[in-house]
Amino acid sequence: MTPTGKRRALVAGTVLGSLLLSSCVIGGDNTSAPKGSDTEVSGTITFQTWNLKNDKFTSYFNDLIAAFEKENPDTEIKWVDQPAEGYQDKLSADAAAGSLPDVVDMGPEAAYTLAQAGVLLDLGKADPAAEKKYLDKAWQAMTFDGLGGGTYGYPWYLNTGPSFFNKKLLAKCALDPGKLPTTYDELFDQAGTMAEKCPDEAMIARMPAIETFGEYGVPLMDEGGRKFTYNDPKGVELVERFRELYAKKGLDEEALNNLQTKEVEEFKAGRLAYLPGSSYTLNDLKETAPDVYKDLAIGPRISNGSPNMYIESLVVNARSKHPGLAKAFATYVTNSANQLAFAQKASVFPSSAGTLDDPYFTEDDGDPATKVRIESTAQVREAVVWWPPAFSGSADSETLREQIAQALLGKKSVKSALDASVTYSNDRLEANG
C-alpha cells in the first residue's frame, strides 16, 4: 500500500540521497551497538502504522498493545498512526532526521529504500530464528538480493484477490459470461471483441504496472536483483497488446492517466467489464453498486503463471534504544494468533506459517464472501510478490507509465519506451547503490 504522485517522483532521488548522506549520523552501517540489549524486553518504544487508527482498527491495536504490556510488565508501547498521503515521504524524512519509530509498518519498496541507507535492522542476522515462523515466500519477499541478501522486515499481512466481471455487459458485447478470461491472452482477445461490439464500454481501464509484467511472464530483474530486465521481447509483447487495444479504441486516452479509484468508479457505473479486486471488493460492490453486484461474475486473478500478491511488514529501526523489545513486539504483532485476528478484521491474509490452514480460510459456509475468501486463499498459496522491492513506487512507476503512454500514443516504439524506462531505473539503482 504505497502512496503515489508526480511530486514524489521528483523528490525520490533527493530523499534517498539525504538518507545516504545522513547515515553517518544515524548509524547507517549498523556497526555501532544501540544503547539497549539485543535480547532484553523492557523499556518504551514507538510503534507506527499508517491509516489504521480509525473506528475499525483502533480497538484491535489498543487491545493488542495492552495484552503485550500485560505479558511484559516492564514495557510501554506508544502507538502512532500516520495518514496514507505522503507516508513514504515522511518515513524517509524521519529516517534522515534520526527520528524513525522503533517498529514501523511498511511494504518492501519503502523498506528497500531505508535498508539501502542502513536505517533498518537486518533480521536475517539479528533474529534468524524468526524465519521459520513465516511463509517462505513472505520471508523471501522481505529479503533483498540487491542488498546482500539481508531480510529487513517481519512479514505481516498479504493481499490478493479475484477478478470481478459484469456479466450483463459481457453478454451485451457478444461475450459469453460463462467463459471468463483467466490468462492475459484471453483477456486481450475478449477486450478486442468488446472494442468492436461496444465502443462506449471497455474491458480494461488500467495501464500495465510492474507487477503486470511479472504476471505476464516477463523477467523483471537479473538473478542478482541489481538490474531491471523487463524490456525483453516478452515485455515488449505485453505492451504491444495494450497498444493494439488502444488502437482499436478498447482503451481510451483517459485510461493512460487512470488511477485505481477511477477504474473502480467505471466498474461501479456499469461501463467497465473487468475489475481486479480483493476480498474487500465484494462487500464494497454489494453496498455501493447493487445493480452491478447482481450481475457479478467472479474468476481468478488474471495471470499467465503465478498471480500477484502484495505484502506489508513490520520493520525495526537499526538505531532503536531497545532492540530486544522492538523485535519482541514486532514478532508478537505478527504471530499466528494475532495475524489471524487481524486478517479476519481487515479482509487480508496472514503471512505466518500454517495460519492459512485455519478453518476461516478453508471451510465454505455458503456465503459468497466466504467463497471469495477460500478461492483467494488458494490463490495466495500460488501467488508471488511480483513488485521488485528495488522498483520505486514513485520515480520508477511514474517513468514506466509515462513511457508506455508515449508508446500507446504513437510517439515512440514500444521497445524504445521500455528501454528508456529500464535505463532510468537502472541508472537510479546504480547512482544510489
What are these regions (language model features)?
Residues 2-113, 132, 177, 325, ...:
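Conserved N-terminal structural module of periplasmic/extracytoplasmic solute-binding proteins
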Residues 66, 70, 171-173, 248, ...:
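Extracytoplasmic/periplasmic substrate-recognition and gating elements
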Residues 70, 145-208, 221-256, 318-324, ...:
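Helix-loop-helix "hinge/cap" segment bordering the ligand-binding cleft or interdomain interface
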Residues 81-90, 109, 182-188, 254-268:
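Short helix-initiation/N-cap motifs at beta->coil->alpha
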Residues 102-105, 273-278:
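Paired acidic/hydrophobic, glycine-rich loop segments that form the ligand-binding mouth/hinge
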Residues 108-160, 295-297:
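Hinge/lid segment of periplasmic solute-binding proteins
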Residues 124-137, 180-182, 196-197, 218-240, ...:
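Short, solvent-exposed loop/beta-turn-alpha elements that line the ligand-binding surface or hinge
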Residues 372-421:
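C-terminal capping/gating helix-and-loop segments adjacent to ligand/active sites or protein-protein/ligand interfaces
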